[in-house]
């Protein structure tokens, strides 16, 4: 099982954690949402939960809860700039369909 990050995503997360001044890493998870069933969740982690799995890539810890891991295994977190827009992009090999707006997916 693995979760990886692109260079640009790792640099962005490191910047966020440095500016925040604390935190173990970044939580990547899923929640029920949207027209396709699931949406990604990103949040800072200060304390690990019992079922958390920790991945480290390029010096950044990515924490995934046990329930989300089955949907996220093999995902690469990227940070992209397209025109005036920028944000995290999830390259998830488990996704079967995405909604038209790109906010939710199913596996």
Swiss-Prot record:
InterPro entries referenced in this protein's UniProt entry, alphabetically: Fe-S_cluster_asmbl/transfer, FeS_biogenesis, FeS_cluster_insertion, FeS_cluster_insertion_CS, HesB-like_dom_sf, IscA_proteobacteria
Cystine pairs: none
Gene Ontology terms: biological process: iron-sulfur cluster assembly
Keyword Cell wall biogenesis/degradation attached: no
GO molecular function, one term: 2 iron, 2 sulfur cluster binding
Entry superkingdom: Bacteria
Family: Belongs to the HesB/IscA family.
Subunit structure: Homodimer; may form tetramers and higher multimers.
UniProt-recorded name of the protein: Iron-binding protein IscA
Species, as recorded: Edwardsiella ictaluri (strain 93-146)
Gene this chain is encoded by: iscA
């Amino acid at each position: 099982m693995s979760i990886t990050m692109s260079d640009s995503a790792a640099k962005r997360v490191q910047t966020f954690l440095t500016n925040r001044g604390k935190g173990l890493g970044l939580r990547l998870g899923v929640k029920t949402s949207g027209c396709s069933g699931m949406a990604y969740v990103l949040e800072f982690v200060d304390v690990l939960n019992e079922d958390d799995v920790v991945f480290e890539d390029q010096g950044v810890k990515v924490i995934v809860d046990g329930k989300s891991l089955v949907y996220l295994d093999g995902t690469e977190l990227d940070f992209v700039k397209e025109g005036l827009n920028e944000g995290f992009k999830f390259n998830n090999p488990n996704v079967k369909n995405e909604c038209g707006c790109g906010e939710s997916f199913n596996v």
